[in-house]
Design a protein with these regions (language model features):
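A short, basic N-terminal segment
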Residues: 1-40, 45, 355
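C-terminal leucine-rich, beta-strand-based interaction scaffolds used for sensing/assembly
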Residues: 2-7, 292, 296-375
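Short, locally clustered residues in the helix-turn-helix/winged-helix DNA-binding domain
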Residues: 34-35, 163, 255, 269, ...
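P-loop NTPase nucleotide-binding core
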Residues: 38-39, 44-48, 52-156
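Conserved Walker B catalytic segment
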Residues: 127-196, 204
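Helix-loop-helix "sensor" segment of P-loop NTPases
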Residues: 201-252, 275-276
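C-terminal helical "lid" of AAA+/P-loop NTPase domains
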Residues: 247-253, 259-273, 311-314, 346
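Conserved C-terminal helix/linker of AAA+ ATPases
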Residues: 271-293
Length: 375
C-alpha cells in the first residue's frame, strides 16, 4: 500500500507534540495552573498559537488521563443562546470517544434538550440540536454546569475567543458565567482571547465580573532560533533545509506569528524545487504562490466593502501599522477625508478586517495585507 507522506507543518488544528514547536515553558505553566485548580486567562493575538498551546497542554499525560478536556471556539457566536449551544456541543464532542457510559451521563443531565438529541446507526449521539431548540438558555446552562460539577472526572474547559461574550446583546452574560463558574468545584477554565484590550478589561477592571478571577498568561512569538531548528528538523525528512538568512526573512516578514510561518513552510516542504537548501528567493516565491492562490478569495472579500472602506483598508496596509488614522499627514497622503475615515474604520473593525491593538492599526490577515501592498 502506498503511504501518504504527512506534511509536518500543520496549519489547521493540532496533531501531536511531535508537530508542535516549542512552547515548553508555556505548556508547563498552563498545566501547572490547571492542575492547581486555577482558572487562566490566556491573552495573545490571533494565529500566534493559543489553541495549539491548549491542545498541547491537554495532551500531557497527567492531564489526558485524569481530566475530561473540552475545547470550544465561540468566535462566531453572536448571543447567549449561541454560546450555550456551542458549549453543549463542545462537551458532547469531547465525551463521545470516551464511551457510552460517559456521554450518556451528560445527555441525561440535559433534560431541556434530551428530546432533540439524535443517534446515528451505531447508536452514537449526534448534536442535532437547533438554535431554536434552546428555549431557556439559563436552564440549559444550569444543566451543563450540573454535569460539570458531577462528572466522573474533573473537567478542563477551554473557551477560545472568550471576549466575544462582551459583545452579546444580553449584558449580563459575564455575570451569569462568573456566578456558575465560581460555584463549580469540579471544573477549571481557560479563557482564551485575541483582543488584548477587551480581555484585559474583562479580567483586570474592578467593575467587571471576572475581575481577579483567573491567572493571566500572555503569549509571545516563538524564539526565532528555536523555530529554525524545528523547521530544519522536519524539512530534513524531505531532504531540504532552510538557510538561517531565509528563515530570518520569513520570521520577521510575519512578525513571528506562528500560523503564517507554518503556512509558508508547509508550501516549501512540498515545493517541486529540487534545491536542497532553501534561500530567501525561495521564501519569496512561496509567499507569492500563496498570494496567487488567495487572489480570487480576496477579490470576493473586498467586493463586500464600499469604495471608501476599501481605500482606507489599502491605506492601512500600505502604511504598515499606523498609530493614527486621523492625522493630517495620513489623510493627505492617501487622499482621505476625516468623516470618511471615521465611518469606514468602525466597519473595518467590526467586521475584523483590521484590529487596533497596542496603539496601532493593522490588517487581521497578513496575507491580505501583502496582497494589497503588491497591488
Amino acid at each position: 500500500m502506498l503511504m501518504v507522506q504527512l506534511n509536518p507543518f500543520i496549519i489547521e488544528g493540532y496533531l501531536s507534540p511531535e508537530y508542535f514547536c516549542d512552547r515548553v515553558e508555556e505548556t508547563a505553566l498552563l498545566t501547572r495552573h490547571l492542575t492547581n485548580r486555577c482558572n487562566v486567562a490566556l491573552i495573545a493575538p490571533r494565529r500566534l498559537g493559543k489553541s495549539g498551546l491548549i491542545y498541547n497542554c491537554f495532551q500531557q499525560e497527567n492531564i489526558r488521563e485524569q481530566y475530561h478536556c473540552i475545547y470550544i471556539d465561540i468566535y462566531d457566536t453572536k448571543n447567549f443562546n449561541e454560546f450555550v449551544y456551542a458549549l453543549g456541543k463542545g462537551i458532547l464532542t469531547a465525551l463521545k470517544p470516551k464511551g457510552r457510559k460517559v456521554w450518556e451521563f451528560f445527555l441525561n443531565m440535559l433534560q431541556s434538550l434530551k428530546s432533540t438529541i439524535s443517534f446515528d446507526i451505531n447508536g452514537n449521539p449526534e448534536w442535532s440540536v437547533g438554535l431554536g431548540d434552546i428555549q431557556a438558555p439559563d436552564i440549559t446552562l444550569d444543566e451543563i454546569f450540573a454535569y460539570l460539577e458531577q462528572a466522573d472526572k474533573p473537567c478542563l474547559v477551554a473557551i477560545d475567543e472568550f471576549q466575544s461574550v462582551a459583545n452579546y446583546p444580553e449584558k449580563t452574560v459575564e455575570a451569569t458565567l462568573r456566578k456558575r463558574i465560581q460555584n463549580c468545584h469540579n471544573a477549571n477554565f481557560v479563557f482564551s482571547g485575541s483582543k488584548r484590550h477587551m480581555m484585559a478589561l474583562m479580567f483586570t477592571s474592578r467593575s467587571r465580573p471576572f475581575y481577579h478571577s483567573s491567572s493571566i498568561m500572555g503569549l509571545e512569538a516563538i524564539n526565532e532560533h528555536t523555530y529554525l531548528e524545528f523547521a530544519n528538523h522536519h524539512l530534513a525528512r524531505n531532504n531540504k533545509e532552510i538557510s538561517a538568512a531565509a528563515f530570518t526573512y520569513l520570521y520577521h516578514h510575519f512578525d513571528g506569528i506562528t500560523w503564517y510561518i507554518q503556512y509558508v513552510l508547509n508550501m516549501l516542504y512540498t515545493s517541486i524545487s529540487d534545491k536542497s537548501l532553501l534561500q530567501e528567493d525561495d521564501v519569496r516565491m512561496g509567499i507569492d504562490g500563496i498570494l496567487s492562490q488567495q487572489r480570487f478569495a480576496y477579490q470576493a472579500l473586498l467586493y463586500q466593502l464600499t469604495a471608501k472602506q476599501k481605500q482606507l483598508l489599502i491605506a492601512i496596509a500600505q502604511e504598515d501599522k499606523p498609530s493614527s488614522l486621523m492625522s493630517q499627514e495620513f489623510l493627505q497622503k492617501y487622499h482621505l477625508g476625516a468623516s470618511t475615515v471615521q465611518g469606514a474604520v468602525k466597519t473595518l473593525l467590526d467586521r475584523d478586517f483590521i484590529t487596533q491593538d497596542e496603539g496601532v492599526y493593522q490588517l487581521c490577515d497578513k496575507f491580505l495585507e501583502l496582497s494589497l501592498r503588491a497591488g
